[in-house]
Amino acid sequence: DSGAYYYNIAEKDLNMQVYRKLRKKLEELGYKVLTSRDSDIDVDFITERSRMVNKTNSDIFISIHFNATGSAYSKSSGIQTYSYSDESDYPSKINPYWHNHPDRMSESKRLAAAIHSLLLAETGAKDAGLLERSFAVLRETAKPAVLLELGYMDNFAENQQIRDSHYQDKLVAGIVKGIQKYYAGK
């Protein structure tokens, strides 16, 4: 699934641009970075990404995305950061123990808050919300997990900004500083 596609760029391509910069920066700082997708392959978003993450010894999981309203000329803008909200309408398929474990939920919220605040500080982007949802990738992952929506692809001005390499560097700086803040608080 290539995700959203607006103004001649696919979400998957933006995701990979930011991910590669983020991985490089984190590895330079001594972090070990694992990925569910390092090339143009399709990985099932419902359970397979979480299953892959759950088999690793990783501490946290960050899912990188770009947003879209579905409108051709959206005025929506900003960064959204999601952590898991346990909703009984969406029971866990592969993570019955950890999906609503209080420690994991608390750590996910703390990770989301740290990254969100520093993304906003680094980029100057509009705060589109620090939110909780029962997205599968957050529900099925057995460790602290966040999903980042780093800007709106269907807003022409924001689309131009999020595809700019220097702006992507600011996104990466915010994510890295957020991760560092999270670990400093442990």
Segments and roles (model prediction):
Residues I9-K186:
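Active-site-proximal helix/loop segments of hydrolytic enzymes
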Residues D1-N8:
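Short glycine-rich His-centered loop
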